[in-house]
Amino acid sequence: TQNDVREGWSATSLICADLWNPGLVHAAMLARPTVLCAPINSASGIVSDDFSNEQNWAINLQFYAMTYGTPVIMTNRFGPEGGSHFWGGSRILGPRGETLAQAEDREMLIHAELSRTAIAKARFELPTHRDADTPLVRDLMLGYR
């Protein structure tokens, strides 16, 4: 769902595994939120020894920020619980996928300044929103029931 957070700014939240489903992300981004909030609950090595949650979350979030010209605010836990270690890595990405702020390997508060002008420019340069053809996607999906 999309929420207005202040005049001219809106946010959509997708929680953890939702961000690994491109269809859910695309559907959420069709509303053109100003910011995507991404609270996750990711531990190191929890998927497999060959899958780096730390590296792959960075790739995933950069891709969506850049593709949709939308800043991403990601939060993750830090510290041990049971046999798992939650790696933290909370970050704020700009509308081109650039890292504006990133937490160190500890609990901490981060902040960054976001610009609606930078968002508009990024969206103009990579027109994912503008070229999204929702009726076409809907029609194509009808064949997969």
Question: For each predicted feature, which ranges?
Answer:
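Short beta-strand-to-turn element immediately C-terminal to the catalytic PLP-Schiff-base lysine
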Residues: 4-6, 93-94, 112-113
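Cysteine/selenocysteine-centered motifs that mediate thiol-based redox chemistry or coordinate metal-sulfur cofactors
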Residues: 2-19, 23-34, 38, 45, ...
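CN hydrolase (nitrilase-like) catalytic-core segments centered on the catalytic cysteine
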Residues: 19-110
